[in-house]
Design a protein with these regions (language model features):
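Short alpha-helical segments and helix-capping/turn motifs at coil-helix boundaries
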Residues: 87-92, 143-144
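Short, high-confidence coil segments that cap the C-terminus of an alpha-helix
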Residues: 44, 99-103
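Conserved "HGTGT" condensation-loop signature of ketosynthase/thiolase-family condensing enzymes
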Residues: 1-74, 108-156
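Alpha-helix C-terminal capping segments
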Residues: 66, 90-99
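Blade-loop segments of beta-propeller domains
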Residues: 77-80
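Short conserved active-site loop signatures built around small residues
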Residues: 84
Length: 156
């Protein structure tokens, strides 16, 4: 098994960018991380892209269209609030397993207005109708309460 090192990281400033596409935002972040590592997309053997809001839109491949298509495999990940972390984990595991030596992991999202944005039916649903539902804050809150009940975990 191989040691795994993070060679470069970066991120764009948080904000709303209605005039930009998700791949354009992701491409900027990817290029900044590659620059931080002193590498280019041509050095990469694979790419792992985390995006939930447009998970069916091949965001990773569209990022490569902007920064340079090299023929490398692209894995698109969607895993709710852990999407970016999942892309990083998959990239890390591919190196640890000895499949690749150098890969790129990128996470990108463009949030809509409100809790559910435009993807999940958000507008017009009162807060009271969302509580106790499958929204991710509720899921995590319920998991925390269950852990507290089973193991005596406290807020401290």
């Amino acid at each position: 098994m191989s040691d795994v090192y993070v060679l470069g990281v970066d991120m764009i400033k948080f904000g709303r960018f209605p005039d930009r596409t998700v791949p354009n935002i992701g491409a900027e972040a990817a290029l900044m991380a590659l620059d931080d590592a002193g590498l280019t997309i041509k050095d990469m053997q694979s790419m792992y892209c985390g995006n939930l809001g447009q998970a069916n839109a091949m965001v990773g491949q569209r990022i490569l269209q902007e920064i340079g298509q090299t023929g490398i495999p692209v894995v698109n990940c969607a895993n709710a609030c852990a999407t970016g972390a999942t892309a990083f984990r998959e990239a890390w595991m591919s190196i640890k397993a000895g499949i690749y030596d150098v890969v790129l992991a990128v996470g990108v999202e463009q949030m809509g207005k409100g809790l559910l944005g435009g993807a999940g039916g958000g507008d017009g649903i009162p807060k009271e109708g969302l509580l106790g539902s499958g929204t991710m804050p509720c899921v995590f809150a319920e998991a925390g309460m269950e852990h507290s009940k089973d193991h005596g975990t406290t807020f401290e």
